[in-house]
Amino acid sequence: HPGKLVRAMIDTLPKNVQLFENAPLINWKKNNDIILCTFKNTTIKTKKIIFATNGFLKSLKIKSNYNFPITLTASMTRSLTDEEFKSIGEPKEWGVLPVRPMGATIRMTKDRRILIRNTAEVYNPFQMSQLDLNKRKLNQKKGIKKRFPQLPDDIIDSSWSGIVSRTRNSSQIFEKIDKNIFAAGCYNGSGIGVGTLFGEQ
């Protein structure tokens, strides 16, 4: 589950890393050799920075003509009961991935949850109302029920949306854009694996 992954990453941050939650970067500028980052309630001054904002690089006016954000929405069921799990054949953990980068994906997790993502759209996730999210959740429930009609209607436990960054030629960004300023992003749906790989090199 993405939430568990993020919490685990936060819990293992090194002591020299500070985390600021609910603090989106509003603006940034460079004066001489000082980079000034403006947040909602504070500012940070630094001499070096890596903008690792992936799909939000464009909103920071970084590589604006190179990448574009796409909103994906996913849903995950609660853990299936013994009876429900038996009704679908008691499968081992599995996943079906799309041939195309933005195609649908569905997975069965070790703890008997079904995860489905079958929406990819140009939509601002910060403006997605609960009503809009519920519409996408209904679409995903239909997808699960089409394959597993024996499962109950209240099977979905959580739904969420997020941003991936796409480029026309499916290449990533990890480069120096100015003195002491670097940008990382455009993983084209490859996510944490590719991001980590670029960060380590």
Language-model region placement:
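Short, hydrophobic/aromatic-rich segments at coil-to-beta transitions
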Residues: 33-36, 91-92, 180
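A conserved FAD-binding loop/helix module that cradles the flavin
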Residues: 126-133, 182-201
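Helical element adjacent to the flavin cofactor pocket in flavoenzyme catalytic cores
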Residues: 1-48
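Secondary-structure boundary/capping motif
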Residues: 1, 29, 166, 191-195
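Active-site substrate-recognition segment that forms the wall
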Residues: 27, 43-44, 48-83, 87-159, ...
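Mid-domain beta-loop-alpha active-site segment that forms a flexible
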Residues: 1-10, 101, 136-143, 198
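Hydrophobic/aromatic beta-strand patches that form the interior of the parallel beta-sheet core
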Residues: 20, 50, 182-184
